[in-house]
Amino acid sequence: MDCHALQSKARNDKNLDSNNNAQKCLESTFENTHAQYDSKRCGGALQALGQFGGGSYLSGNDRPQIAPILSNRSPKTESPQAKTPPVLVSLTSFPARLPYLHHTLYSLLTQDYKDFHIALFLSSSEVRPDELPLILKIFARLGLLSIHFVEENLRAYKKLFYALQAYPEHIIITIDDDQIYAPNTISLLLESYARFPRAIHTNWTYDAAFLAEILDIDPAQYLPIIKENAPHLALASVGVSGVLYPPSPFSQEFFNTHAIVSLAPYSDDLWFFVMSVLNDVPKVLVKNALEHPKESSIAQDESPNLWEINCEQNRNYDQLRALLEAYPQARAKILESLELA
C-alpha cells in the first residue's frame, strides 16, 4: 500500500468467512478422503471456486472428490481480449503472510475473467516447500497456482522481476498479497490493454504533489495528466490495486540488481516507473478505475513494513530522487513529456 495514493481501508468479513469455509472443505478433503461433506457450510463457498476453469471440486454424495480443474479448462467468458497473449497474475509473499494468502487467492479465483494462471514467487532463504500452508499446496496440486522458489530475496520486486524472466511472452498482472480484489479487476485491466497494447495499465497512480516535488515543478503542471483512459509517459503506477504489464516492457537495465538494491531497495513501484520511462512505455489509468481494494485485514505485516519505511520515514522521496539522479535521462524524458523541457 502506498501513502501517496488515496487509501480506503475496509474489512470484507463476508468474503473472509466464505474463504475460510472453502479452505476448511478443501483441507479436510485432502487430509481425509472419507470426510463428510456439509453442503450448508461449504457448498456455496466452493461453488464459485469449482466453476473456475470449467471444472468441479465436488462429485458423489458423501465423499467429495477434488478434480484437477484446469485439465479441461473451458472458460465461459465473452471478452474482447480473446486474442491477447496468455495472462499471468503474479504475486510474492513472505512467511508471516503465507497463512492468510488464500484470502487474496480466492478473490482471484472468483474473477469474472477466467483465462489466466497465477504464479507465486517466494524466496528460498525465507521459506522451504515443506513449510508452505496446506491450502497453498492444495492450490498448486489442483493446477491453480504455480509456486516458484528463487534464491535472491528482492522483497516486493520478486513478483515482476522473476515473472518477466519465467513468462516472457505473457501479459503480467501484479497484485499484492494482503488485498481482496474486486471481481472485475482483471477484466478492466485487459479491456484497457486492448485499447493501448503498448502501455502499462493501472487502477491507481502516485499523486501530483509527490511527483511535482521530486521534479521541482508546480503540481498544477503535473495534475492534468492524471485522468482515465489517457496514456502518458509521466504517470507512475501504484501496485496495490493491480498493474498490467504488456510482454517485454523493459530493457535489460530493469534486471540490474545492484542498482535496485542501492537505489530503491524498498520501492519496486518507483523502479518500475523509472524503467518504463527509460523504455518510452506510457502508463494508463484504466477507464472506470477501481477504488482501493479491501485489505484482508488479518495479514501479518513486516516490522517495519514497507508502508512504514516508504511513507513514515519518507523513503519514497529519497528513493525516487536517487533514481532520477542515477538516470538523468529519465528525468529529462518526464519533463519533455510534460512539455517542460
Predicted regions and their residues:
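Conserved catalytic core of nucleotide-sugar-dependent glycosyltransferases
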Residues: 182, 188-257
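Short, acidic, metal-binding catalytic loop of nucleotide-sugar glycosyltransferases
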Residues: 106-115
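Short beta-strand-to-loop acidic/aromatic patch adjacent to the donor-nucleotide binding site
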Residues: 170-178
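Cell-envelope/extracellular polymer assembly enzymes that use nucleotide-activated donors
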Residues: 86-88, 117, 271
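A conserved hydrophobic helix/loop-capping motif in glycosyltransferases and polysaccharide synthases
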Residues: 88-96, 111
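A cross-taxon signal for low-complexity, glycine/charged-rich
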Residues: 5-19, 27-31, 36-45, 49-63, ...
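Active-site-proximal specificity loops/subdomain of glycosyltransferases
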Residues: 124-166
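C-terminal catalytic/acceptor-binding lobe
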Residues: 30, 259-341
